[in-house]
Amino acid sequence: MMEERDIRAFVFGTTRYFEVAAQQAATVGSPFLVTQGAPEVHDYTGVIEVSGRRRGVVYFSAPRGMLTVLLMKMNESDVSHENLCDLVGEVANTISGNVRRDFGKDFTISPPSVVTGHAAPITLPSGCRPVVIPIHWRSHAARLVVCLQ
């Protein structure tokens, strides 16, 4: 079961990513627990599997428009599908890596995998309830989903 301090670590990791990479802060909405099914995803989702002391998944899901603007904010003019996939994986990996500092070396993260499409299934660990952290940046909305045992 995740505790409030665990969620705070992910919130900080998320806001820190946008402050550094986009040089523009993101705001985070109130995290909420999903009690039935899996949370919805956007156009692109970067998935990180977690093992070690904690097990589960962390994923960052964002619409194409948000990722396109983020690439341009990073002075990248190539907004191809491949670059959008690379970016969403990088965001998920960086946020998880930032959190690893708080959770310690026993918080092992996989390289990111990327899923595209709204109906893409993300496998969640059985018996684990995901926490959704809404992210707002400029006029865009994304979400970080954390499901750890």
What are these regions (language model features)?
Residues M1-Q149:
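N-terminal auxiliary interaction/assembly segments of multi-subunit proteins
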